[in-house]
């Protein structure tokens, strides 16, 4: 029983620590390189690449600048 409770507690803590970006998508650049894709994936930053423009959620902007530039 203790193992189950510990597992549930750890799962809850880990899921609560993950970022949940919900802001409006804003343009951040023109190019999407392999480095940028990998950095966004590692930092769990969602992105859209449409018509030659790169977009990320507005509330992920600071994280993207600090970690991927």
Swiss-Prot record:
It comes from Bacillus subtilis (strain 168). A lipid is attached at residue 17 (S-diacylglycerol cysteine). It is found in: Cell membrane. Keywords: Cell membrane, Lipoprotein, Membrane, Palmitate, Signal. Disulfide bonds: none annotated. This is Uncharacterized lipoprotein YvzJ. The keyword Acetylation does not apply. The keyword Membrane applies. One of its GO terms (cellular component) is plasma membrane. Residues 1-16 form the signal peptide. A lipid is attached at residue 17 (N-palmitoyl cysteine). It is a lipid-anchor.
């Amino acid at each position: 029983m203790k193992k189950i409770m510990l597992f549930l507690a750890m799962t809850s803590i880990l899921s609560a620590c993950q970022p949940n970006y919900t802001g409006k998508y804003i343009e951040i650049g023109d190019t999407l390189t392999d480095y940028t894709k990998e950095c966004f994936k590692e930092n769990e930053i969602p992105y859209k690449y449409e018509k030659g423009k790169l977009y990320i959620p507005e509330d992920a902007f600071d994280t993207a600048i600090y970690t991927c530039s």
